[in-house]
């Protein structure tokens, strides 16, 4: 179980209250698929992922990026029990989709990069620390079924 300070809770809540899901989600997933091309194998049904331009312009990638980012809402709303909040998604990704659990960390890094670019100077070291702690808890929860 993750221990959260009041300040960390406030930072996470503030990030999500200002989150531009329609911008950050597609950019983060696109970045992950471009920077780590082996992650594309899980998205073969998404159509043309031939190059960066195709990935960035792919409506299926954009829609899934938004869905993934909204999936983080579950963790934000259940910060005291993140592991249990993601049990069903962990099972889906491990047993049905067979996603390499390392991919969750890669995507979380891409989300952090895109969020930092969007927030600019407001993305302080303290903000980054709280956000990465949150994402690490989500990544761990999503990988729970693999252990």
From Swiss-Prot:
The keyword Iron applies. Heme b binds at residues 64, 93. InterPro entries: Globin, Globin-like_sf, Globin/Proto, Hemoglobin_b, Hemoglobin_oxygen_transport. Keywords: Heme, Iron, Metal-binding, Oxygen transport, Transport. GO terms for biological process: hydrogen peroxide catabolic process. Residues 3-147 form the Globin domain. Signal peptide: none annotated. GO terms for molecular function: haptoglobin binding; heme binding; metal ion binding; organic acid binding; oxygen binding; oxygen carrier activity; peroxidase activity. It holds the Pfam family Globin. It comes from the Eukaryota. Belongs to the globin family. Heterotetramer of two alpha chains and two beta chains. PANTHER family: HEMOGLOBIN FAMILY MEMBER, HEMOGLOBIN SUBUNIT EPSILON. This is Hemoglobin subunit beta. It comes from Trematomus newnesi. The lineage of its organism: Eukaryota, Metazoa, Chordata, Craniata, Vertebrata.
